[in-house]
Each structure stands twice: as C-alpha cells, then as structure tokens.
Amino acid sequence: AADVLVFQEDDERFNIGAGRTRDGKYLVLEAASHITSESWFLAADQPTGQFTLVAAREDDHEYSLDHRNGLFYIRTNDKGRNFRLVTAPVATPGREHWTERIPHRAGVALEDVDLFANFFIAAEREDGLPRLRLWQFAGEGPEASQTQEISFPEPAYNAYSGTNRIFDAKTFRYGYTSLVTPSSVFEFDPATGASKLLKQVEVPGNFDRTLYASERLHSTASDGTQVPVSLVYRKDAFVHGRNPLYVYAYGSYGYALPIGFNSNRLSLLDRGVVLAYAHIRGGGDLGEPWHDAGKMLAKRNTFTDFIACVEHLTTSGYGDPARVAIEGGSAGGLLMGAVTNMRPDLFRAVLSHVPFVDVMNTMLDASLPLTVPEYEEWGNPNEEKYFTYMLSYSPYDNLKAASYPAILVKTSLYDSQVMYWEPAKYVAKLRTLKQDARPLLLVTNMQAGHGGASGRYDYLKEIAFDYAFTLRELGII
C-alpha cells in the first residue's frame, strides 16, 4: 500500500515532531519554530482518525501538552514569557476553555511538567537554578497543591527529569550533577519526601570531590544587570589573583547553560586552572526574558555580559588577568569572535569551535538550510534595522588591524549548521590583519559534522589538543 500523508508543514521556519501522552491515550503532533508552536491530537486507539487542533498558531505563542483523566495539561506562554500551566477538556481544548492551574511568575520559569496519575513535577528555574517541585492531586480531578520541593545543597548544579515512562508510578526519577558531583540518578518518593541514590557515574583515578570547591557569584553588566557565574577550582591549588582562568559561555537560543561534572576538566583543575561558566543574556538561564534580552536587536548584551563576567572574575581574584582563556562553540563561537574583536586585550587564548562568524553572508543566503528559521533569533538582514545591527557585531566583518590573543579555530568538513568556509575565511582574513606573532590555528576535521569527532576515543584526542593549546598559552607547560 502507498504511504499515507498524515501531516505536511509548508512554513520553512517550522519543524514537526510526533509523540504520545504519558498515559498512552493520545498521539500528539507538534509544529514548532524558535518562538511559535501548534499541536494536534488523536486518540491512540483510532489511528485512522483525524487529528484535532488544540490551539491555532499565533506568533510568539508556544505550548505543549500531556493528558490525565479527560483533561489536557498545557504549558503555555500566552500570559507571560515564563509560562504557566492550564488545563482544558479533551472535547473542547481551545484557548477559550483553558483553566489556570499554575500562574505565570515573573521570577520563575516553568520549563517542563512531568504528569503522572497521582502527582506531577513542575520543573522550574529560579535565579538561574533548576527547581523540582511536587504537586499532588487531591483526587481524580485537576485540583492539586504543591506539597514539596526537592532540595539541592550545592551552590551551582543541574537537576532534571529522568526517564519516567510509567504513568501510574509511585516514585519519580531525576538526574543530578554539579561541578564537583558526578552525574547521578535519584529516585524520589512523594510519600516520604526522600530521595534515594540509584546510580552515580564512576570517576577513575581516585577522584576525591572534597579537594574541589564550587561557587556561584554575580557580575554587574554594563547596564547594571546582575549576571550569574558558576565556577570551580581545586582548593589546595588556589592562590588569590594568581591562577589561570578558563571561562566558557554560549548565550543564544534561550539555552540554559547546564552546570555539570566533567571528568575531562580535572586535567585543568589539577593544574590550578579556575573554571568559570558565564550565564549571559541570550541564554535561558533566568527564563525567556533573559533570552529576549540577548537576541535580535539586543544581541550585543550577550557580548558585554561576557566581558563584564571576565573582568569581575579577575578583579575579584579568581584569576590572573594576564592568563585568561575563553571557549565557545557554534553560536558560542560567534560570542568568541565578537568579544575578541571588542576586547582583544582581555584574553590570552581563545578556543572557538565550529564558530558562526560570518553572520552577514550566512543570514543573507536564504538557500542555506538554517537561515530562514534563524531570523527569529538574529533578525532578518533584508530589513535595514537588522542589517545595520547585525553588521555591527558580525565577527568576520569587524576584524581589524590589531594585536589579537592566541586563537584556535576548529571546524568540520561535513558541518551542515556552520559551513566550514565560515571559519576558514575568518582565519584567512584575520591572518592578513593581525599585528602580533601569537598562534592562529585552523583545524579542520575532514570526517566530522557539527558535533566534532564521534568515535569512542576520537573526541578525547580533540579535547587533548584543546588542552595542550590552552596549557601552553597560559604558561602551564
């Protein structure tokens, strides 16, 4: 038999996906762009039926849904950027029938809802940190009350929903990690409020977490905004104002920078390097308003936030200002290029992975697969106001005759998201302009894509190369 067309999306800004509610009763189709979504549902026992629309798409409105006892539980940003939770009857799911269950809150982002038969977990983000809050149902209806919050003792961490496939489960699994705690899986029992450790990743080499300290602090941006920074260092190697400093950031697409344990980083920490993670605007670390404040015509906030974080770390004694290395990849590579143009004196070494550095030519070429969908993040340069603004920070277009830090640029031949010629032409132009003798390296992986080497050990070789470059430039080896 011929394939049957179930759904077709003609707007190239949108991607489509299919799933099922946790109770298994409904199939769900979703079409979503960066800022807008639309969902349809169909009873799972009627696969040849017609899908029903929940709420028609409207620019800047995103929503997602799950099902329990004849009601859809819908996470929506219709009343505010940080989302709220509503319910709607399956028979009449339109917005006019939505009933609020958790209101929108200015300082708390509702990132996800894990729905079960007897309770649900609201995954939220407050002051840049994840929160997991338990709501228990009073009965078969939607009435529920928040009864507990899972507590996390460390100042900088990541906590997230685990694999929970059973709708009538009595417990809830979640993941936890921090800058000094390896990735762990816990089981939370709503009846007792206790969490039980089920599994923790083993770290070879006699790892002792008590040797390391993690902190969370805030930097003041140029407009007065407080920008969170998470950091980790080895206690017995820390000397105020003397340590090499390594700062990582991303700051785009509303992506909240995950703070987690990485055994590879021990190679740096044990050599006295202080590692810092800057939660700059453009990311989602403080909810969608944080994203809004670092995209489109506010994108330069991303760069000035990062500069403020580095300056605050060095003036506060967390690093030697003459030995600062920075790292970012993809859109984080755009960040690396922009801040290096703005403040080349601030950094000793720059690691830029698959960097989006030729903003103008890429965003003016609508034939590239990601260009049109990306208008919602960067702006459409075919409009003068966006063209002028994007040109003001595009790394390739703002290279100048000046002294630059040591720079390592890495790209991949089969990268379909940031084409290899972007980093290549960036390096070629910079090589003709730079007024110093510091290294400028372009490394092209001839087999990889956007994520770099994927072999079991190949990616470790790439990390070793990065660290060798960093340690050499910071004067450690």
Residue spans of the language-model regions?
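Active-site-proximal cap/loop segments of hydrolase catalytic domains
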Residues: 277-477
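Beta-propeller blade termini and top-face loops
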Residues: 4, 24, 30, 34-42, ...
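Structured, non-catalytic alpha/beta "coupling" segments that mediate domain-domain communication
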Residues: 72-73, 82-84, 170-198, 357
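Multi-bladed beta-propeller domains
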Residues: 1-15, 44-62, 89-110, 114, ...
